[in-house]
Amino acid sequence: MYTEINEMLTPKVLKVQAESPYKARIVLEPLERGFGHTLGNALRRILLSSMPGSAITEASIDGVLHEYSTIEGVQEDVVDLLLNLKSVAIKLTVGNEAQVTLNKEGPCQVTAGDIQLTHGQEIINPELVIANLNEKGKLNMTLKVERGIGFHNTDAFVRYHEDEIEKKTVGKLKIDNSFSPVKKVAYFVDSARVENRTDLDKLTIELETNGTIDAEEAIRISASILQRQLHAFVDMKFEESRADNKERNDFDPVLLRSVDDLELTVRSANCLKAENIHYIGDLVQRTESELLKTPNLGKKSLTEIKDVLASRSLSLGMKLENWPPASLGE
C-alpha cells in the first residue's frame, strides 16, 4: 500500500505572482487528478474562516450608552462608527490584547491614523475614514483590540459570558468582527501535463489580505493549519504500527514464520495445514500425542517434524502466552 502512495505525484512547482502588496496569485502543480479541488477547497475554507489575526472587538465612546445613539457634531451615527471600526486593519505584534484610544475635536475628518497606539500595535490602513466632525463635534473613544481566530460573534460572547455581561460597565459596545486577515479567496483548477500524462491538475489560488500579512504568508499558515489537523490521523496509524511491532517483538521471529519455511515433506505439510497449523508458533504448542491423532500423520512424519524443530532450537509442547499476536497475518 505504501509503495503506491510513494509513487503518487507531488507538486514540484510553486509560483507566487504578486499583483499588489496585498494581493497575489499562487500556482501549484502538478497534482494527481482530483487533488486540485481537494486541496483548493480545503485551503479556501481555512483562509476564510480559520486564520489567526487581530481586530477591534469593543468600543467605549464618551456620551454613548448604546449603539443606537447619535453624537452631536458627528455626521455618522454610532452604528456607522462601529461599522467603520470593523474595517480598521490593525496588527498586534505584542500580546493577545491591547487598548488604544482616539480623541479628536472638529471640524475635521477622523481616520484610522488618528488612533493613538501604545507599544506593539500597527495600523495598516491609516487613511480609512472613521468619522466626520463639524465645529461642534468631539469624539473620544477607547478601543479594545484582541487576537483571535475566525469570526468574533457578539451574540455567542453574551451567551457564554452572561455573568460578566451583567457586571460590565454600561456603554461598552461589543463589535462583531472577523479576525481573519484574508478578505477574498478564489481557486481555479486547470489541466497540467507531465511528459505523457495529461490527466493532472494545476491549482491556482487568488487571494487578497488586509495587509496585516502578505498573501504568501497566508497560504503558508493555512497549509500549516491543515497539516496540523490531519497529523492526528498520521499519528494514529503510527501508534498502531508501533503497538503491533511491540506485540510481535514479544515472540521469537521464527515463531511468526509459516510452517512452509520448515521445508517438510508434502505429506507432513498437508497434514499440518489440515489441522489449521499455519505458523511455527502454532506447531510448537502441539504435543506428540496431539499430532499423532492427526489423520495420515504417522511416526515417521512426527520424527521429521521433531528433527526440523530441533535444528531451530525449538520443540513440541512449548507454552506461548498471548499467542497468537493480534497482528499475525497482516
Curated annotation (Swiss-Prot):
Keyword rRNA-binding: no
Catalytic EC class: transferase
CDD domains xref list: RNAP_alpha_NTD (cd06928)
GO annotation (BP), single: DNA-templated transcription
Keywords attached to this entry: DNA-directed RNA polymerase, Nucleotidyltransferase, Transcription, Transferase
Record's GO cellular component terms: cytoplasm; DNA-directed RNA polymerase complex
Molecular function per GO: DNA binding; DNA-directed RNA polymerase activity; protein dimerization activity
InterPro entries in UniProt: DNA-dir_RNA_pol_insert, DNA-dir_RNA_pol_RpoA/D/Rpb3, DNA-dir_RpoA, RBP11-like, RNAP_asu_C, RNApol_insert_sf
EC number: 2.7.7.6
Pfam families: RNA_pol_A_bac, RNA_pol_A_CTD, RNA_pol_L
Catalysed reactions listed for this entry: RNA(n) + a ribonucleoside 5'-triphosphate = RNA(n+1) + diphosphate
Region (Alpha N-terminal domain (alpha-NTD)) location: 1-237
SUPFAM superfamilies membership: C-terminal domain of RNA polymerase alpha subunit, Insert subdomain of RNA polymerase alpha subunit, RBP11-like subunits of RNA polymerase
Subunit text: Homodimer. The RNAP catalytic core consists of 2 alpha, 1 beta, 1 beta' and 1 omega subunit. When a sigma factor is associated with the core the holoenzyme is formed, which can initiate transcription.
Role noted for this protein: DNA-dependent RNA polymerase catalyzes the transcription of DNA into RNA using the four ribonucleoside triphosphates as substrates.
Sequence similarity: Belongs to the RNA polymerase alpha chain family.
Domain notes: The N-terminal domain is essential for RNAP assembly and basal transcription, whereas the C-terminal domain is involved in interaction with transcriptional regulators and with upstream promoter elements.
Protein name listed in UniProt: DNA-directed RNA polymerase subunit alpha
Native source organism of the sequence: Legionella pneumophila (strain Corby)
Gene for this chain: rpoA
